[in-house]
């Protein structure tokens, strides 16, 4: 016959086993029963280069990949994101997950007003946006809040000023063509897994360079991108399309340095294990300006 203490111990053990079983069922239920809210996607592009082409008519682009695990790049990306995320529009957005973002700013349409948008790669997960009204535009659902809007069923998802968002929908749907010139430059960039990138076009690109004796714009396209090399260290690409007789030349600014030219488009590929050196590295350039020689006729007899 079992003693009272043994009976009590058996009951406690049975209770513990029952709790473990219930806990296992709950864990299984949460793992298998919960799914991230998803959305329908009507138009979609994948890959950085194809995404950049959709906003190739903008004047300034930033690309930030939040999936990088490199601490140096994470710090650089966080610094840019901290600045961008101060925008008032983020009062109206809530994400379930974000892989990367492209920020595109367009030339001003009036004094002090620059249309802009954020493209968020969220896969098929849902983005929550506080809105006052909703409308259909070329088969895409637009949610509107004052001067801000979100194109919901596209990927990357677009959030920004309404005019910029509608321009993006026009492009991703094929209604509007991309900027062929800048899209062609983007196509020629080395196919790396960029984690951070900056693109400037038109006058925004030309403002970063000044040369004595030059007349008119020097460049109309600037790209700078950084990637983590699989074998260690970092790769950096800088590309510029020159409007005058300017070109990249050989240099030893990094451990590895190479220049490729496609007509006036100059591309410098750099590699180094020193992150600070990679971040600050710029290609060396040469300029050739031909000046007319004034003819000295002297005195005629």
Language-model region placement:
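Secretory targeting signatures
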Residues: 1-39, 157, 301
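Structural boundary/hinge residues at secondary-structure and domain interfaces
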Residues: 28-131, 136, 187-205, 260-301
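An internal, short helix-loop-strand segment that often contains or flanks glycine-aspartate motifs
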Residues: 41-55, 61-63, 87-94, 137-236, ...
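Hydrophobic, Leu/Ile/Phe/Ala-enriched alpha-helical segments that form helix-helix packing faces
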Residues: 80-84, 215, 253
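Secondary-structure transition/turn motif
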Residues: 122-123, 145-147, 161-164, 239-244, ...
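Surface-exposed flexible segments
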Residues: 126-137, 163-174, 241-256
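C-terminal interaction module
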Residues: 219-270, 275
